Regions:
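Contiguous, well-ordered alpha-helical segments that form the cores/surfaces of helical PPI scaffolds
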Residues: 111-124, 146
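Conserved catalytic cores of very large enzyme subunits
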Residues: 1-107, 128, 134-169
């Protein structure tokens, strides 16, 4: 990644994903400090929400869009929890011996929910009346992303696993 003229420092990056930014503060809470945990972290997987489609389906209906997005976030969480459980089961039963030896557990791995097509969501939602560069479109995106972040916190509390939000390509 390019750190010049950005708010990132090289020590903040733990992945080669283009936009994955793990909130390493959660790892600090889990013991061993940042240095002791960061090398043993990653993402279980990424489930991406197609925001452009939601904008199309819920044109002009923000409450409907948010309600459907919440349902999709729940489905994404269920999928990631099943994947986490399955991988951990197989690690514990010898299927992934190197992962078991070097990681031991998936406790320091995030479940990632991504969004894409935010500008297209705004354009579809507004029937092309405005886009992300318009204050109305920008404000809509801020509200949507704030809601997704709220849901990440709820999911962390409900599952005990770390969740993060990513802009997926």
């Amino acid at each position: 990644q390019n750190f010049i003229n950005s708010d990132l420092d090289p020590h903040m990056i733990r992945s080669m994903c283009c936009r994955l930014q793990l909130d390493l503060r959660e790892l600090l809470k889990r013991g061993n400090g940042l240095f002791g945990s960061a090398e043993l972290t990653g993402s279980i997987g990424v489930v991406t929400l197609n925001m452009a489609r939601l904008g199309y389906l819920y044109k002009g209906d923000e409450a409907g869009l948010v309600a459907q997005m919440d349902r999709l976030i729940d489905l994404a969480s269920q999928s990631l929890e099943i994947k986490r459980e399955t991988i951990q089961f197989h690690m514990d039963h010898g299927l992934f011996p190197y992962s078991k030896r070097y990681l031991g557990t998936l406790d320091n791995h995030f479940s990632t929910i991504g969004v894409n097509g935010m500008n297209e969501m705004v354009r579809n939602f507004s029937d092309d009346a405005y886009d992300l560069t318009d204050p109305r479109g920008f404000d809509l995106c801020v509200r949507i992303l704030d809601r997704v972040r709220e849901r990440m916190v709820e999911l962390q509390e409900a599952t005990g696993h770390m969740y993060n939000l990513e802009a997926t390509p």
